């Protein structure tokens, strides 16, 4: 009971204290609060409530009242005044879109916009430094527009808006470089995309124009994403995406009008937009009118927020031009101030406009034109020609005019050319000439700022080859050749671009920095309407001051061959029909040249090809290189996959037919400076297929992005079909695409030069150090050439595929690149590949195996054949089967011979020992006899008597021997004393016994 009493007392006390506090607050005034709408309920209704301003405390706020329905909105030029809940017109100096908001000021990032830089690589490499590598990537405000990143990070510009009803978002953009992927998509508050993913890819801009993109929005929360992802290899820098004038429609109401930004004004109430202040005026924010500058000393550009002081005139403020030829065919150099003129001549440091030069003779007409007695040159009529110095003449019989354009004299701009100036950030140079004629050349103009694009266009309706080569296949249709130079101290660039059938402009080549006098040729293979564009930019950095006005590009001559609407500067021999009716020309069949004597078509000799731009004379048929033959049309040479050559007095034959299919090498991975993983994909067609180029590389950007871009299937800008080509592959897990990205396809080899075991052919050399080898068999080198030239490869690209025998690698084997050049090239112009496979071994011959004969067993002998210890051959002759032949065994006779030999040896040894012992005894007896005889040499010898004396016994037996012993015979032979024959006497004396 006590607890309840205490609680009740506490409540009563609080009420008393609150009432006392409210009594002490002042009554709310209109300036102390503002009105807001509550959130809409399920019925689409809401309430208007009064909310105290920050820092204000008052009592007596107005009671809530029912507000306008949630879908209510005011018209353009009006805003909803919540206090009265009525639409009111915007005051002068402000504007309103009614149901929309607009962002056209980009001096800083507008409120509500945010930047998010991410790295969409999903693999593990470089995971530690990826977040930091993109921390400096963002969208950058540039005043009138906002600029995307130009690296290979993924950066999103995000803005969230809540719509009470369905609306739309639109923006202007400039998107020129397909090396950046540009997406615009919308998510709801659950981070779910609200439209088809195939619609999120933004189309490339046409010819540097600002394009408009609009997408419908649903009611509710819409999170808008402008996302760019760079696909950059090496040191390449992409052109960023530019966005301006973002407009969002569908906002339920606008509670206030937007002020006009500096440089604009609105002079009427209820304006839906602001007007730009004209030149030499300025305005502040929320201006009702523009204020004029003091024009004698000040100036301003369109849309200026202040006036600038006019500087003294310098050489940067004037330019010179050549006047058109007058009726006397005279011209002169005159000087003019750059318009609009912003400098002051009366200042002490100012220069004066130089006087005009003396009149000079006009340069002659360009080839194909003639002077008609007026100040202009006229084109020669059809069927006639002129060198520009003489009247037009009719081509002789048996000849036809050479059509084209050759511009080398620049007194006036030709009729099929135009010039303009363009800047993405301002309109200072709009209406200016981007290029100026200068007699023997045409040069870039002054422009408004240093980052202007100075544009020169040449329109060609189509291309048609001469009549004599109309039947040729695979021949070029025409060429565009221009001679130029860049005179720069800055980072200037001259771009050469091509637009086919007025679809989109693609960059062909760029020439950065200072370039000396040089020539560039672009070959045309497809008949279409072309717009060739030269665009010169002094620097890509926007600057208020002019620092590089003296940087210029000069084009001395432009030559276009085989143009349909061209003129003729000469005539060429053409082929005549068999009946030679009149002088009508007939087309030669494919692979035929025009004989100089008869002007008839004759087929090129075997294994020669016809030059694409010269068919007159037998010398137009060029012999094919070693190991190659011409195709049926004599338009190119190719290898039949059969190669034969002599090495160290040995003829080696190869058969590469099993390698004739298109081979693929995926080399990598490599990584950009930001860590993007990419691969180099090479497709190569080695030989065969009748000379048809089978290697195809395709840019699948359209497949990846789903862009609806019209493109012919044979458009060379999307598909490269040749002998060897290269593409840059970014795996699907690298940037979050649904499939791997293939881009930057390059033609590396469109002409086959020959195959040889030598290390060089027609100026292309492969060093032995590139692919070291210890084999006795040298590599077989296939030499290719790409005729397309670039600024870095003035002679075109060259490719060498070295075929190396490796019996351990069966089938297709392995293809590798030089160890020191992982991209197959070290200079970007010469590419080298090593193809190791057993199929690259020479065909086997009889010298590649040896014969081994077995022992004779049971009257039979087997002969086996085995490959040499290191088999370096394939296919060819087969290893012979085992051979069995009859034989006679020699085991028995060998045993008999051994027995007889052993017996004979023992017998000889025994006889030798016997006779030697007997000879020793005889020598002993003889020596004793000699000693006895010497002791009695003073005594008379006893008379020899054959009779037996009295008293003596017949005991002595005398034996006479005239034969030599075996040992003595051997001695006599050794001493060659055959005349001394000793008599052996054996005595038996009783006297000796008595002694």
Curated annotation (Swiss-Prot):
GO cellular component terms attached to this protein's record: membrane; plasma membrane
Function: Functions as a regulator of the BMP signaling pathway and is involved in epidermal differentiation.
Induction: Expression is down-regulated by ras.
GO terms (BP aspect): negative regulation of nervous system development; positive regulation of BMP signaling pathway; positive regulation of epidermis development
Endpoints of the signal sequence: 1-21
Segments on the Cytoplasmic face: 917-995
Organism encoding this protein: Xenopus laevis (African clawed frog)
Glycosylation sites: 24, 136, 245, 372, 527, 649, 683, 700, 758, 883
Annotated protein name in UniProt: Endosome/lysosome-associated apoptosis and autophagy regulator family member 2
Tissue and organ distribution: Expressed in the animal half of the embryo during gastrulation, becoming restricted to the ventral ectoderm at stage 12.5. At the neurula stage, expressed in the anterior ectoderm surrounding the neural plate, and weakly in the epidermis. Expression is especially high in the presumptive hatching gland and cement gland regions. Surprisingly, by the tailbud stage (stage 22), expression is limited to the hatching gland and is not seen in the cement gland. Conversely, in tadpoles expressed broadly in the head, heart and fin.
Residues passing through the membrane, by range: 896-916
Subcellular location: Cell membrane
UniProt key word NADP: no
Extracellular side: 22-895
Top-rank lineage group of the source organism: Eukaryota
Family: Belongs to the ELAPOR family.
Broad class of the protein's primary localization: membrane
InterPro entries for this protein: Elapor1-like_3rd, Elapor1/2, Elapor1/2_C, Elapor1/2_GBD, Elapor1/2_MRH, Elapor1/2_TNFR-like, Growth_fac_rcpt_cys_sf, Man6P_isomerase_rcpt-bd_dom_sf
Name of one Pfam family that matches: ELAPOR1_C
UniProt KW keywords: Cell membrane, Disulfide bond, Glycoprotein, Membrane, Signal, Transmembrane, Transmembrane helix
Knocked-out gene: effects: Morpholino knockdown induces severe developmental defects including dorsal open phenotype and the reduction of head and tail structures at the tailbud stage.
Disulphide bonds in the chain: 641-687, 697-725, 793-829, 805-841
Residue intervals of the MRH domain: 639-843
GO MF annotations, alphabetized: BMP receptor binding
Topology in the lipid bilayer: Single-pass type I membrane protein
